[in-house]
């Protein structure tokens, strides 16, 4: 198994990637047989400027990996594609990439593997697609250039170079396909980004429209409220005069009713007071009975109120007890007749009463009218009380006088009726009770 290694010069600090990949930077190219373990010592010798311990650890890891690769390629029967499930088997060594590419059929190279060297700026740049199989080393001992320079090795090198050239042609075509696929993926990503940008734009537009709708709703609510307030104010302005007119009309009606009531009361008072003001000499003939109206009740002269007598035990009065002289009480009918004659008819009363016109009465202030009404009511109440007081002593006198003037006479008649059938006589008695009032 042959390992092809391309040696580069040591990379300096300020050296760029393009400077390193130039042809001038290539130092030497050698091929090694991986079957011999001693060859690996020349390949994996390297150093680290910062820490030597880390280089030893990483060198050990790299040696193990290379040994595993050598074992897998020595026996062709044991080689399987399932061992390399991923597209690339990549490992890092001294901050550079090492890898074996599966897509270019590395397994079918007749147990020969070619590892072309290419230095990369790891991890900013990926490994190169120009060469399918590569093995990167940072620095290798220059003494290895004098190793294995016999003719057999030269023939193997020629064969491997020819085969590698043939493979490079197929690799270039496959690389083009890969690049095209990558470009399509990039275009798809761009399209997806464009589509996502369009989606975000549409979402932003929708959000803006929603915000404008909400603002318009708020403005509409405010305008509706303002219009509603204006409508209510206008309605109130229209309704208030009507209500005022109705109130004024009601007040006028109430005033008219009060004035009518006052006029009626004044007329009644004047009718009651007119016979007192008439002269005693003037006598007016009463109207005929057809036109005669019932006179209004007049107040009777006030009598001293009888003191309430205490109940005394009633004793049998002697029959011949002297009675106090009582004045003969005049008959009520006789008292009423001359008064009825003196009352003039209703028409004459209205003529004699000098009433002020209604205009003058209406001009009087309402306070005087109210005072007059109160006085009239008080007078009427006093008159009613006087009448009740007068009626009470009269009833008492009548109750006292009735038992003294009443006399009862009983007459009995005995009638004997003969029964013709039985020849018997049955007496029947009839009694009569008569009462006479002595005045």
UniProtKB/Swiss-Prot annotation:
Disulphide-bridged cysteine pairs: none
Region listing for Disordered, in residue ranges: 268-439
UniProt feature, compositional bias: Low complexity: 268-284, 350-439
InterPro entries assigned: MBLAC1 (IPR039344)
Compositional bias of kind Pro residues: 285-328
Cited PANTHER family: METALLO-BETA-LACTAMASE DOMAIN-CONTAINING PROTEIN 1
Entry protein name: Putative uncharacterized protein DDB_G0294196
Organism: Dictyostelium discoideum
């Amino acid at each position: 198994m042959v390992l092809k290694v391309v040696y580069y010069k040591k990379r300096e600090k300020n050296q760029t990637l393009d400077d390193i990949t130039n042809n001038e930077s290539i130092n030497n190219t050698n091929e090694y047989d991986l079957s011999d373990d001693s060859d690996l010592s020349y390949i994996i010798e390297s150093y680290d400027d910062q820490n030597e311990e880390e280089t030893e650890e990483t060198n050990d890891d790299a040696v193990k990996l290379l040994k595993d690769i050598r074992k897998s390629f020595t026996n062709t029967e044991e080689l399987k594609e399932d061992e390399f499930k991923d597209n690339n088997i990549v490992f890092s060594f001294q901050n550079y990439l090492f890898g074996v590419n599966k897509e270019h059929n590395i397994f079918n190279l007749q147990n020969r593997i070619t590892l072309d060297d290419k230095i990369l700026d790891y991890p900013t740049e990926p490994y190169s697609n120009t060469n399918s199989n590569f093995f990167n080393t940072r620095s290798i001992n220059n003494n290895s250039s004098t190793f294995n320079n016999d003719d057999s090795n030269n023939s193997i090198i020629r064969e491997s170079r020819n085969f590698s050239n043939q493979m490079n042609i197929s690799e270039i075509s496959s690389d083009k396909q890969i690049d095209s696929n990558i470009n399509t993926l990039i275009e798809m990503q761009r399209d997806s980004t464009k589509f996502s940008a369009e989606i975000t734009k549409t979402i932003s537009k929708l959000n803006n429209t929603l915000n404008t709708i909400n603002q318009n709703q708020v403005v509409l609510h405010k305008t509706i409220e303002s219009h509603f307030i204006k409508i209510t104010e206008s309605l109130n302005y229209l309704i208030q005069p009507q209500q005022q007119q109705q109130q004024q009309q009601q007040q006028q009606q109430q005033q008219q009713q009060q004035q009518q009531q006052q006029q009626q009361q004044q007329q009644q008072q004047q009718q009651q007071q007119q016979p007192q003001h008439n002269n005693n000499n003037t006598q007016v003939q009463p109207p005929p009975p057809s036109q005669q109206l019932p006179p209004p009740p007049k107040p009777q002269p006030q009598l001293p109120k009888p003191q309430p007598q205490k109940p005394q035990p009633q004793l049998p009065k002697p029959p011949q007890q002297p009675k106090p002289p009582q004045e003969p009480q005049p008959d009520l009918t006789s008292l009423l007749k001359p008064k009825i004659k003196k009352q003039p008819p209703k028409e004459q009363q209205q003529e004699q009463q000098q009433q002020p016109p209604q205009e003058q009465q209406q001009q009087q202030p309402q306070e005087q009218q109210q005072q007059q009404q109160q006085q009239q009511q008080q007078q009427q109440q006093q008159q009613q009380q006087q009448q009740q007081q007068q009626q009470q002593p009269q009833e008492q006198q009548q109750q006292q006088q009735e038992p003294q003037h009443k006399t009862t006479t009983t007459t009995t008649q005995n009638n004997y009726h003969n029964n013709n059938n039985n020849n018997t006589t049955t007496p029947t008695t009839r009694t009569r009770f008569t009462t006479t009032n002595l005045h």
